[in-house]
Design a protein with these regions (language model features):
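PP2C/PPM-type serine/threonine phosphatase catalytic domain
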Residues: 1-200
Length: 200
């Protein structure tokens, strides 16, 4: 799901981690189409935090429904996945990236099912970025669309860890434009992938 620089990041275990969320409707829209979830799961494996942000697509019907539905479905899958880990050995073998992708795929299916039953919501979708952080300092990230993950540290400052699925990112990847042109590009809001828009 993520084509970014590195989906697995080590955060030193002695460092303090802060998890939080804030959402603001902004000055353009009347409805906040964002939905955020922070889960803390504990078991035989220790403790993991699962973070998810879904940004309903502006201008599309029921973007706020898509983001809420996606986050709810992803969280259900993730809780179920970790509840099956009864011993630490199974946790060590758990592929966090596939756990995240499984949640995203389920969210995609649920949004498509919702739109098939509610034609007025046709075309609704959401972008998403999610991460699993375990108590050993392992961080795994997945994203769809242009929702981003950043790591902030004293050593490296603020570093973007995901790559957008967008028209402008495609131009950057082909070296057709530079970073400055990307920031001001007239098509910078066109995304190429989203949760809930196609079966794949």
């Amino acid at each position: 799901m993520n084509d970014g620089p590195d989906t697995n990041i080590d955060v030193p275990t002695g460092k303090r981690r802060i998890f939080g969320s804030i959402s603001d409707v902004g000055k353009v829209r009347e409805t906040d189409e964002d939905f955020v979830s922070v889960l803390k799961l504990s078991g035989a494996f220790g403790t993991v935090h699962i973070l998810a942000v879904a940004d309903g697509m502006g201008g599309h019907a029921k973007g706020e429904v898509a983001s809420k539905l996606a986050t709810k479905e992803m969280c259900k899958v993730w809780v179920e996945s970790f509840s099956k880990i009864a011993v630490p050995e199974l946790f060590n073998e758990t592929d966090f990236e596939s756990v995240l992708e499984k949640g995203i795929k389920k969210a995609n299916e649920e949004i498509l099912e919702y739109t098939s039953k509610n034609p007025e919501a046709s075309g609704m979708g959401t972008t998403s970025v999610c991460a699993i952080v375990d108590d050993r300092g392992r961080v795994t990230i997945a994203n769809v669309g242009d929702s981003r993950a950043y790591v902030i540290s004293d050593k490296s400052g603020i570093r973007q860890e995901t790559k957008d699925h967008s028209f402008v990112q495609g131009l950057l990847d082909k070296n057709e434009i530079n970073e400055e042109e990307a920031r001001n590009h007239p098509n910078k809001n066109i995304i190429t992938k989203a949760v809930g828009l196609s079966p794949s």
